[in-house]
Amino acid sequence: MLAGMLAAVLACVSGVPAADFGANDDAGKYADDAGAASYREMASLGMREALITVRWRPSDPLGLAERPLLDLTVAAARSAGLAVVFATYPYPPREIADGVARPDAFGAWLAELARQYPDVREFVVGNEPNQPAFWRPQLSRRAQLSARAFGPFLAAGYDAIKAVDPDLIVVGVGLSPRGNDRPDARSNVSTSPVRFLAALGAWYRASGRDRPLMDGLSFHPYPNSATDALDRGYPWPNAGFANLDRVKQAVWDAFAGSAQPTTLDGLRLYLDEVGWQVDTAGRDGYTGDENVPVTDERSQAEVYAALVRAAACDPDVAAVNLFGFRDDALRTGFQAGLYRADGSPRPALEAVQSAIAETARGCAEVAPVWRPARAVLGAQRPTVALGRRTVSVELTAAEGAVARVCLLDGRHTQASARLVVSARRVAGGTCAAGVVTANRHTRFRLVRATEQTLAVLLTAQTNPGRATTLVRPVATCLRELPLLCRSSVRRHP
């Protein structure tokens, strides 16, 4: 009873609506009953929404080929008491690469879609534009391309939908959790979520736009492997459910101080695709061979229950949609549903139902409060080794950073060293510069004099306004003095 009272109090104190739970599954659209049975099952579990895909084909800019199916399935979902969310995006990517797709045409199509379906109050604009399966090209040898190309489509979509009804919710991007950031990769040339958001923010600021791009950010926190526990995330600059703070930081780095809100001033996260695939060996209703690592049904149930509870306790999360309410029969498809292909329920069904019911009463623990980092994340004390004529310095950080490492003549205070090393030209010293790769040690070597000050300026790759200065005296013998660390904060101009 006490726990229930505490949960209710916390829910009231936060002032933020609890996360909605639902499923992202197009099977209902093609079912004989237009999905009516599945939607009733979703509602019985406590789910509140159904996410349905609606693709825009650039070569048929006014077309809506699935209109008859959409009419029936939207009505069936609404009849079951579910809110309907349309997930919209240009497709196929070859028409984007060929220049057939135009932002204004996409916006006009979205406006008509919103007018035709007034009961649909939320639109996701974009689907994994950081992946080549949905947007091409991604990268050149010199620049990130997909974010700057996608930005005008998101802007056009936002403006068009808001022109129909300013109260409609526009959720942007549909970000994939992973990308390799390698234009020379043999396959799947893609962009990490952190770097995609950085590039989208750079495009937005350069565009001069004075309106938002989105009310919320859609993110797909799939695990790197279905065998991963919920709390196992990705290394920077990728991100999973365990790394939502990294996504929030990336949004803040990209948009803080602009007309586009961050999670500090209203933007929320919509986890519109997430799922842990399960072993189906020996089960009826499946064909083909499995092509990815999978987990067992008990582990899936534990992960899903923990996912629901954790999302409910994060005030920045607006929605969670499990990808696949019922399994695909072909094993090369997706098998993460609450129902197996033969229609029998998995243990995850009861686990999700119980967790939704529990969280409907509020968060049983104090909800986490996220605040942006103002310095380079995870910047560590440098390792310093003296040679006869050189100083070797090893640096590491939890994110990518640009380093400037200087040996300044004489003794310096932390403040004076920071001032000198931040200047374009350093008088009275020698410097080296380079990139510090996240979670790896990067070595710099400088020629030294008898007595100097080692000064290091680390600047976050995704936000020049986040910098950390490290200072250490260097004499004939290295003096083991405490490291002095301070951060300087400057928003983007």
Language-model segment annotations:
Residues G428-F444:
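Aromatic sugar-binding surface patches on proteins
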Residues P61, P129, A133-F134, Q144, ...:
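Aromatic-rich peripheral "rim/lid" segments of glycoside hydrolase catalytic domains that contact
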Residues M42-S187, N224, D328:
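Substrate-binding cleft and catalytic face of glycoside hydrolase catalytic domains
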Residues S354-E394, A475-P493:
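Short, compositionally biased P/S/T/A/G/V-rich stretches that sit at domain boundaries
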Residues G28-S44, R102-L113, S192-A206, A301-A310:
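Short, acidic/polar
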Residues V391-A397, V405-D409:
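Aromatic/hydrophobic beta-strand junction motif of beta-rich domains
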Residues R102-P103, G107, L145-V294:
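Noncatalytic carbohydrate-binding groove/subsite architecture in carbohydrate-active enzymes
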